[in-house]
């Protein structure tokens, strides 16, 4: 196999993954503000394996730190595997994020830095907002529901734009981090974060 074509194929698959993320989940101009996590231990470290909605995935957490404001930062790689042949990698994404706690719930604001070794274009930058359901060795990652978020933007509960030029509406939230925190303090989280992104288990 031509290695250059193989590498290009991985980049194309990574790009398609970014497009599918944008189509399935709203993005935010700002990360969520909230309280810092406590007892971090090694929650966001090591190797986690699991399933996306369309195939197997491995997430490698390679960086975690806390800044002077108490905000917890993480970074890592997401590697997609072939659905029928998990030993084959279909591409990878480098991401970073901020983790906060609101109402004893854990939230991740994640943005992509690289896909398949190429920097993410400026127009594709943005935070994907997730609710994390954490157990000792498992993690469920829930994304914003597109329809619910669009309705919230349309009635002014959240600031943002809804672009219906595509088959699936593309949503961009513009509320700042404090406004997002205030909204999440009273929101129906089960309804808002009802789109499953990944189910992961820590590799022992």
What residues fall within each predicted segment?
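C-terminal motif of bacterial Sec signal peptides marking the signal peptidase cleavage site
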Residues: 20-23
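Calycin-type beta-barrel ligand-binding domains and close structural analogs
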Residues: 25-43, 51-57, 64-204
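Bacterial N-terminal signal peptides that target proteins for export
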Residues: 2-12
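Generic hydrophobic-segment detector
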Residues: 13-14, 94
């Amino acid at each position: 196999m031509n290695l250059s074509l193989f590498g290009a194929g991985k980049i194309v698959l990574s790009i398609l993954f970014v497009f599918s993320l944008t189509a399935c989940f709203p993005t935010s101009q700002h990360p969520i503000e909230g309280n810092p996590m406590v007892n971090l231990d090694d929650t966001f470290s090591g190797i986690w394996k699991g399933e996306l909605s369309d195939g197997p995935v491995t997430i490698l957490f390679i960086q975690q730190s806390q800044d002077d404001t108490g905000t917890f930062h993480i970074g890592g790689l997401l590697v997609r595997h072939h659905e029928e042949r998990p030993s084959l990698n279909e591409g990878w994404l480098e991401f970073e994020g901020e983790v906060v706690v609101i109402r004893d719930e854990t939230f991740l604001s994640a943005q992509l830095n690289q896909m398949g070794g190429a920097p993410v274009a400026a127009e594709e930058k943005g935070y994907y907002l997730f609710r994390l359901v954490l157990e000792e060795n498992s993690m469920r990652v829930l994304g914003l529901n597109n329809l619910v978020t669009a309705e919230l933007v349309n009635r002014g509960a959240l600031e943002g734009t809804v672009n219906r030029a595509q088959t699936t509406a593309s949503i961009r939230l513009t509320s700042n981090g404090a406004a997002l925190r205030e909204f999440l303090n009273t929101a129906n989280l089960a309804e808002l974060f009802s789109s499953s992104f990944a189910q992961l288990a820590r590799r022992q």
